[in-house]
Amino acid sequence: MKNQIVIISLILCMILLSFCKKGGSEPTPDPIVPDPVLPKINITIDKSTKYQTIDGFGFFGAADVWWAGAGSLWNDAWGEKVISDLGITIWRNEIFPPSIAGANQDADWAKQKPVVQGLKEKADKYNLNLKFIATVWSPPADLKWECNFSWAGDLAATRNAGAVSTKNGGTLNPNKYTEYADWLKSNIQLYKDAGVDLYGLSLQNELMFRQTFNSCMYTSAWFNEMANTVVPKIKANYPNVKIFGAENMLDMEGKDENWSVFYHSGIKKSVTTTANIDILAVHGYSDGIAASSGSALAKMWTNHAAQFSTPMNKQAWMTETSGYVDAWEKTGDKPGALNLAMDIHSGLYFGNMSAWVWWQGSQGTMNEFSLMNGTTTGKKYSVSKQFYRYIRPGAVRVKSTSSDQDFFVTAFLNTAKGTHTIVIINSGSADKAVSIKGNDLPTTFKMYRTNSGTENCTYIKDVNSGVSNSFAVPAKTIVTLQAGGDAL
């Protein structure tokens, strides 16, 4: 009996040992949880086909509007946020004319200088060559005349001496071009004295519109005449300052029925003015206030590239837009944050746009004109960050195609930084599984995503490229894929 017990025990031990050799004693790996089974689409990146080089992304203004108290315009936390988190690489400012009786100004250089120097210090901290650009809304009042015209090509336009202000339009006195150039040069020097080389200068903001705030108006012929006289005087002292313009509406400079009769057409017709304008700049409004948004932008940007920036060999910038609510999708007639993402895409993809500059970066309340309230951010900020933070100056857009019409894709290679960036927008109502293919792509990308919920340019996970790999892109989201380290 004892022998039988021993034999049975030995048999049980052998069975147990056999089970262990099959792996029962080895740690069991965590189960691989794949993305849900979703309809699959392909995105193809062709790095051999190259388009525009990126100059940057940014906004206008200080931590609050210029008419706010000086103490609210700069603080260290805000400066840190916009440089190291949002990732602006362009900052736009107004050159204010002197105040006169009945026409006070929101700011002067004494009020602006601490903001300029604060941003420069923050940019230097991160080895960022922040591009400072400035726009004139109105020349000094004593340099202006009255004017009257109905559109840019109005041959019956008149201008003459009269009672004028910095507000409510008027035009530059053509006998004061030298004085205007001298005034502009003195303002460029203010930046230089503060340790900043001004990167770009616009001679006039939205030159078609008579506004109750600072404004000045030009016909196409007057603008060319002014630029051809003033720019050489500026360049004689500051040859590296880039002149951008005309800062008119993309609706006017890009629509089928408009592009041939407005300012960029006038610039193109003049060999001299073409040489004097370094960068073609438009604003993303239909009338100076309402945002130009939606599918029509693709045609406007396509026209602008085909008619102007490509044949003239000029960079294209979008230097002001707003009018988007912070809701994720369109509210009434106001576009939302997801619309903003698609509109940035339109400029990059269809217009070969090199720069995108929002209107007011921050103010005391978050509204359709601002991205932030101090350091408090919303969906427009997060959507902007998907582009600003990861597509850095010097990045070159390369060819990208999608097999799904609901997916909008732009891709960028930054050789100097060794980074690859792909921005994907799923505008549709269905989640999809995405495969990224192309020659010589990084194996792994970090994925950042913004949606209508709690994701705000949030790191999701690492994903792999290649046709055998895929990752989920939920409906109505924007994703940025980044490889090669931190772009900042």
Which residues does each predicted region cover?
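Bacterial Sec-dependent N-terminal signal peptides
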Residues: 16-40
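Sec-dependent bacterial lipoprotein signal peptides
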Residues: 1-18
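N-terminal catalytic cores of secreted or lumenal carbohydrate-active enzymes
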Residues: 40-199, 203, 211, 218-224, ...
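Carbohydrate-binding surface patches
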Residues: 403-443, 476
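C-terminal beta-strand-rich structural cap/linker in extracellular carbohydrate-active enzymes
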Residues: 461-488
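Noncatalytic carbohydrate-binding groove/subsite architecture in carbohydrate-active enzymes
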Residues: 177, 214-343
